[in-house]
Design a protein with these regions (language model features):
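Polytopic membrane enzymes that build or remodel cell-surface glycoconjugates and lipids
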Residues: 1-194
Length: 194
């Protein structure tokens, strides 16, 4: 919920998106490595989307993570075993997580009483934090290793749950039904691990 009419920091957001694509674009030419081989290339269960529980719970050698495995099956249905398609999905999820970081930081600052004491809007601090988070070298494995989509999706679910909590906390009249997105995000976070 916006407290004023300031526009979002679009230049900073655009810079973050360009920086992220540049930082991770070298992964597009990569191949399937390590766990990618047994869990994607050699996993016959992800070659089907119907019934959905087949890719979610069958095949592969490692413990199953239902939602990521379903996403691998969707990738396989659209791109086959073309590696760039898998990287595009990982980068898209990472970009979504960057947006959620900006949202969370902005709302936490507002809840803490940030009133532009240093003359920097909370939106700009949130966007700058997201920029740093998006291109930080520690994110490289999660974004460029295809099988690490499991970690990206878990992070997405946790960030959605936190964002829903913060937005619900700001709402003047919270109703029980408004907790539903938060509960679903918590379930999604737990569904990424056995």
């Amino acid at each position: 919920m916006r407290h004023d009419s300031r526009p979002p920091p679009w230049p900073l957001i655009a810079l973050a998106a360009v920086g992220m694509v540049l930082a991770y674009s070298n992964g597009f030419g990569g191949t399937f490595v390590m766990d990618d081989v047994s869990e994607i290339v050699e996993n016959e269960a992800i070659r089907t989307l119907w019934p959905p529980w087949v890719p979610m719970f069958e095949g592969g050698r490692l413990a199953h993570r239902p939602l990521p495995y379903l996403s691998f099956a969707m990738n396989e249905a659209i791109h086959g075993l073309a590696v760039p398609g898998y990287h595009v999905v990982n980068i898209g999820l990472h970009c979504l997580n960057g947006f959620l970081v900006a949202l969370i930081v902005t709302h936490v600052l507002r809840l803490a009483g940030w009133r532009q004491q240093p003359r920097i809007p909370a939106e700009w601090v949130g966007a700058a934090t997201a920029c740093l988070w998006l291109v930080h070298p520690l994110q490289t494995q999660a974004v460029t290793d295809i099988y690490s989509r499991i970690e990206i999706m878990g992070t997405t679910a946790i960030f959605v749950a936190v964002a829903c909590f913060l937005l619900g906390r700001q709402a003047a009249t919270a109703r029980l039904g408004e907790a539903s997105p938060c509960a679903r995000a918590c379930w999604a976070a737990s569904a990424r691990r056995p």
